[in-house]
Design a protein with these regions (language model features):
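Glycoside hydrolase catalytic-domain groove-lining segments
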Residues: 243-296, 328
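Mature N-terminal, pre-catalytic/accessory segment of carbohydrate-active enzymes
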Residues: 17-64, 461
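Carbohydrate-binding surface patches
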Residues: 375-412, 417-422, 448-456, 460-461
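Aromatic/acidic polysaccharide-binding cleft in carbohydrate-active enzymes
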Residues: 283-381
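Conserved, mostly hydrophobic/aromatic
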Residues: 39, 113, 153, 172, ...
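Alpha-helical scaffolding within the catalytic cores
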Residues: 22-27, 50-55, 103-108, 155-160, ...
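Hydrophobic h-region of N-terminal signal peptides that target proteins for export
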Residues: 8-18
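Substrate-binding cleft and catalytic face of glycoside hydrolase catalytic domains
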Residues: 62-251
Length: 461
């Protein structure tokens, strides 16, 4: 009797899942898996002395395609990294004199990034300031001097200036979140006008001397009016603009996806159909931003939320869902950070494990994508691929805790990994069942996890 009831239950779940469209047909191909697993910054330099604490091998293993710099100095306390004011600390000095630059820490950081196998996007700007007063983020009044400093930084890394390198760093962005006074402080409140003039002053000499580079901005905090006005400024003055990015800290993958579509549409309307669209910073968002800085009691709970299973499955869902979007680049903020990062001690937390799972799906961009749907209204996101004679399926149960049944066509499952509150992308042997006749795979959900993600490895028929 119990056996009959169990089979009926499986049949019911299967019928429901097929009605939901949880079918993976490995014969249906859709190009390649796009490597949208970019990140902000790289393995921390301030704990690299000892092999046991060095994050570099983990970052290398994650196969990150591109790492863009923002808040690198904050991620590495005590190190003068990346920011303009840390490379060229005394603004009144001669910008043509190599002795006035401090390149060595940033040199090591850039080389460290490249050692992971990742490209670099170098942000010419400053780290955010949460202090009462503003110091490094005050808008310079001499834009030409600022541009002179920036072109020398580019020359150092791409043309060997000042005992530098020829690294061919392609991507150069200007500033970050210029619509916020915490990162671009304009005493007159004219952030848009100031940023536009700053951007133009910096990128014109870069593109003139290094035409193969890509330049872009504004990396705003979701202010479409600011973004559109900036793009219109570039159009009206014929200012180079190769990519446009913004920041997003939603708790819903569809909100992020809609913002990407809106930005693509805006660029096409304004006159930049070839400009790339990207998200400069993204992460499962906090429920209250002020709690992180002003409420120690709530900050601990907020940090746990940002590193927990809902956040991890959100990350996996974003990487899956944005395959069907105009996004060219996504950058997760920020794996090496303590609050926002990939790590629980020396081990990967759910966010880091989501990126590890995606790495297995993508195979450095060589994996063929299988055409599967997602069901955001039900909190279910699917991604499937095949490479090396194997098939892979990633199923995300975002904020739902029920079982799932997949119908697989052209493949037989051989192992199932699960990410949940307890299981850290580990193989589960007793929580799945394969019925070869109809080709159904039952995936048992964990008992006490608000979200879960499965990674299924298959042999292709």
């Amino acid at each position: 009797m119990k056996s009959t009831l169990a089979l009926l239950a499986i049949a019911y779940v299967a019928a429901t899942s097929f009605a939901d469209g949880l079918v993976v047909d490995f014969a249906k191909e859709k190009g390649k898996i796009r490597r949208l697993n970019g990140i902000c910054n790289t393995a921390r330099i301030n704990n690299s002395m000892h092999a046991k604490s060095d994050q570099l091998p983990i970052f290398k293993d994650l196969e990150i395609p591109c790492s863009r710099y923002h808040d690198a100095a904050l991620n590495n306390p005590g190190y003068a990294l990346v920011d303009i004011s840390r490379i060229f600390p005394l603004f009144h000095l001669d910008a043509d004199d190599p002795r006035n630059y401090i390149f060595k820490p940033t040199d090591d950081y850039v080389l460290r990034t490249l050692a992971t196998g990742s490209e670099v996007e170098f942000k010419l700007g400053e780290s955010i300031e949460h202090s009462k007063n503003r110091y490094r983020v005050v808008a310079p009044t001499d834009m030409k001097k600022l541009a002179d400093i920036c072109i020398h930084i580019v020359r150092h890394y791409n043309a060997g200036w000042a005992n530098g390198y020829k690294l061919n760093i392609r991507r150069w962005s200007v500033w970050e979140e210029p619509n916020l006074e915490q990162i671009l402080y304009c005493p007159d409140g004219k952030n848009l006008e100031t940023y536009c003039r700053m951007y133009e002053a910096i990128v014109r000499p870069i593109k003139a001397e290094f035409p193969e580079t890509l330049v872009g901005g504004p990396e705003d905090t979701g202010d479409m009016n600011f973004r559109r006005a900036f793009v219109q400024y570039c159009r009206d003055r014929s200012v180079p603009l190769d990519f446009v990015m913004f920041d997003n800290y939603s708790r819903d993958p569809e909100v992020l996806r809609n913002c990407i579509f809106e930005t693509r549409k805006m660029l096409d309307e304004v006159g930049f159909p070839k400009a790339r669209v990207g998200v400069a910073e993204w992460h499962y968002g906090p429920t209250g931003w002020q709690d992180l800085n002003n409420n120690p009691a709530k900050a601990k709970a907020t940090t746990a939320d940002l590193q927990g299973i809902d956040s991890g499955v959100y990350s996996a869902s974003v990487l899956a869902r944005m395959q069907d979007s105009p996004a060219d680049d996504l950058f997760f903020y920020v794996p090496s950070g303590k609050t926002w990062g990939f790590f629980d001690g020396s081990q990967l937390n759910p966010n880091g494990l989501a990126f590890k799972a995606f790495k297995m799906m993508a195979a450095k961009g060589e994996a063929t994508r299988v055409d599967v749907p997602s069901f955001p209204e039900r909190g279910r996101y699917l991604l499937a691929s095949k490479h090396g004679g194997k098939g892979w399926v990633m199923l995300c149960n975002f904020k739902r805790s029920d079982d799932a049944v997949l119908r697989l066509k052209g493949a037989t499952p051989v192992s199932v990994l699960r990410l949940d509150d307890v299981c850290r992308l580990e193989e589960v042997r007793d929580d799945w069942r394969w019925d070869a006749a109809p080709g159904t795979l039952l995936l048992k959900a964990p008992l006490a996890s608000t979200s879960a993600m499965w990674l299924v490895e298959c042999n292709l028929d």
